[in-house]
Regions:
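Extended intrinsically disordered or low-complexity regions, especially N/C-terminal cytosolic tails and loops
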Residues: 1-200, 212-295
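C-terminal substrate/ligand-recognition segments
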Residues: 203
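Acidic/aromatic/glycine-rich contiguous surface patches that form carbohydrate-binding/processing clefts
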Residues: 208
């Protein structure tokens, strides 16, 4: 398979590429940590199969995670083809995967990676802008209570939760999304991340039967062509996933993961919101293709 192939990337192709281009000695492949050379080989294997992205950022993540964790996370974007092979959902890019790993690193369990790019270039600027807006609009209590000096998803989501319970509206998360979109010119990397926060808190509000406006795309006048480039964010699976995170938050679980303990909630929601079986793997990739078809 080469870059010009019309077929989606198969995970086995990438694994074979890495093994064939590195010497691992008698003990075979070292799954615990990839060195730089083997990380570069894995990246090259991905790119040879059509997944392009920013090399330096991808290498940093792959080096920190190791092959198994990286490929496990990448499988969230996979479906099973007619031959029973795991392949990427059409339209998936390496940048898309890396962006989600950097932003949603809590989904990777013990993953420990450098977030220097995220913290140094994203959080201080957003923290200052959002704090300024909050003070000017009598929301400073939300900011100070949660000590949001450096923005991240968990703190911002909790502040948004608090805002919803206080005033029964979506002013705080909606304005946060607007500020972020405006400051970064609706660029792909930041908008895709922070749109997730908007739907994350929106899912919580909807679960609590609050009458809120959760259609952020129209309010921010997001270009339609930009929305179309984020198929995995702008669909029902993403909203269901965020709703499950909200359910866990209400149950006192502050750090949620898409794990097997959420299975019943997932399938119950899928019964209410039928979607393509191909998308189900995004939430519960342990299910077989045959089981997924029942949705």
């Amino acid at each position: 398979m080469n870059k010009d192939s019309m077929s989606p990337m198969c995970f086995l192709d990438v694994e074979h590429y890495v093994v064939s281009h590195n010497e691992f000695g008698e003990n075979g492949f070292d799954n615990s940590k990839l060195d730089k050379a083997s990380s570069e080989s894995l990246l090259q294997g991905l790119k040879n199969n059509g997944l392009e992205g920013e090399d330096d950022r991808a290498l940093e993540v792959i080096l920190s995670m190791g092959k198994d964790k990286f490929m496990s996370y990448a499988k969230l974007y996979s479906i099973e083809n007619a031959l029973g092979e795991l392949v990427f959902i059409p339209g998936t890019t390496l940048d898309r995967i890396i962006d989600d790993i950097l932003f949603n690193n809590d989904l990777c369990g013990e993953l420990s990676i450098s977030l220097s790019f995220f913290r140094n270039n994203l959080e201080p600027k957003l923290g200052e802008s959002i704090s300024t807006w909050a003070e000017e609009n009598d929301w400073s209590g939300i900011i100070s209570e949660h000590s949001i000096n450096y923005m991240n998803r968990e703190k911002l989501a909790k502040a948004s939760f608090e805002a919803i319970w206080m005033d029964y509206d979506m002013t705080f998360p909606r304005e946060v999304a607007r500020i972020i979109a405006n400051e970064y010119g609706m660029d792909e990397y930041h908008f895709s991340q922070w749109l997730n926060i908007a739907s994350y808190v929106s899912g919580l509000a909807q679960f609590r039967n609050k009458l809120v406006d959760h259609v952020f795309l129209d309010e921010m006048e997001c270009p339609k062509n930009l929305v179309s480039r984020f198929p995995l964010w702008n669909n029902k699976v993403n909203m269901i996933g965020n709703l499950i995170l909200a359910l866990d938050y209400l149950n006192g679980v502050e750090e949620s993961h898409f794990d097997l303990s959420l299975e019943n909630k997932v399938w119950g929601l899928l019964d209410e919101y039928p979607i393509s079986p191909a998308r189900i793997g995004f939430i519960s990739n342990n299910k077989t293709n045959q089981e997924a078809k029942r949705a």
